[in-house]
From Swiss-Prot:
PANTHER family with a match to the protein in the record: UPF0234 PROTEIN YAJQ (PTHR30476:SF0)
GO CC list: cytosol
Protein name per the record: Nucleotide-binding protein BBR47_25280
Keyword GTP-binding: no
Pfam families xref list: DUF520
Organism: Brevibacillus brevis (strain 47 / JCM 6285 / NBRC 100599)
Function: Nucleotide-binding protein.
């Protein structure tokens, strides 16, 4: 049995789920008593979330509400890269959060070193924003998946195309 097995390591955020989480968070913000009359909003511009509120405290509450809704929808919150809080129009404050899609070179190298540290005989290929892992044994590939899941990576990864 010389047929090789493989899988791909990717880091993706489902934009439809992010949109659903934003809608439910906005409903909660509309209905909460402490947000009555506030200018709080959440919007999705391309692959960037924009959070706006009256002040820093309300902005942090909006962020907490959104994070709760994202977690309920299984959206990886590790893949949010927050910018700094900046003043916006009308005395409000704004914060942008970039949705990280794909694995950048630095994280690909980290994942590659985790795979090498296992000492298993597998091959890795970095392909744009994903990593392909190929090996003869499916058991070895399962061990690689477990090692990567246990590692503390700065972004959430998914394993697809397992053959």
């Amino acid at each position: 049995m010389s047929k090789e097995s493989s899988f791909d390591i990717v880091s993706k955020v489902e934009l439809a789920e992010v949109n659903n989480a934003i809608q439910t968070a906005l409903k909660e913000i509309e209905n909460r008593f402490d947000f009555k009359g506030s200018k709080s909003s959440i919007s999705l511009e391309k692959e960037e979330l924009v959070l706006v509120s009256d002040d820093d405290f309300k902005l942090s509450q909006v962020k907490d509400i959104l994070l709760g809704k994202l977690v309920k929808r299984d959206v990886p919150i590790k893949n949010l890269d927050y910018g700094k809080i900046e003043p916006a129009a009308g005395g409000t404050v704004r914060q942008r959060a970039k949705l990280v899609q794909g694995i950048d070179k630095d994280n690909a190298k980290k994942i590659n070193s985790i795979i090498k540290d296992t000492g298993l005989k597998v091959k890795t290929q970095i392909q744009d924003d994903q990593i392909r892992v190929t090996g003869k044994s499916k058991d070895e590939l399962q061990q690689i998946i477990n090692a990567i899941r246990k590692a503390d990576l700065p972004l959430e990864v998914q394993f697809i195309n397992y053959r």
